[in-house]
Swiss-Prot record:
Record-stated family: Belongs to the acyl carrier protein (ACP) family.
UniProt keywords, alphabetically: Cytoplasm, Fatty acid biosynthesis, Fatty acid metabolism, Lipid biosynthesis, Lipid metabolism, Phosphopantetheine, Phosphoprotein
SUPFAM superfamilies: ACP-like (SSF47336)
Lineage, broadest ranks: Bacteria, Bacillati, Cyanobacteriota, Cyanophyceae, Acaryochloridales
Family annotation (Pfam families): PP-binding (PF00550)
UniProt pathway annotation: Lipid metabolism; fatty acid biosynthesis
Protein's name according to its UniProt entry: Acyl carrier protein
Amino acid sequence: MNQSEILEKVKAIVADQLSVDPEKVVPEASFAEDLNADSLDSVELIMALEEEFGVEIPDEEAEKLKTVQDVLDFINNKVAA
């Protein structure tokens, strides 16, 4: 899976989980500030990402995922490993 495929999947998951327009899901978007995600949204988003990409995102790592780019970097590192 290449980076553009990962980006498209992440955008789709974020847009679906947070009920936002996919056009708003850009790498620099903050989940809390730009996409209005609350803590429950964040938990559900992490679970959806884990399921889609077959990775485990520990709580201490999940807390660091503040933007779409943070998620992309994390997934790219896990998938490339």
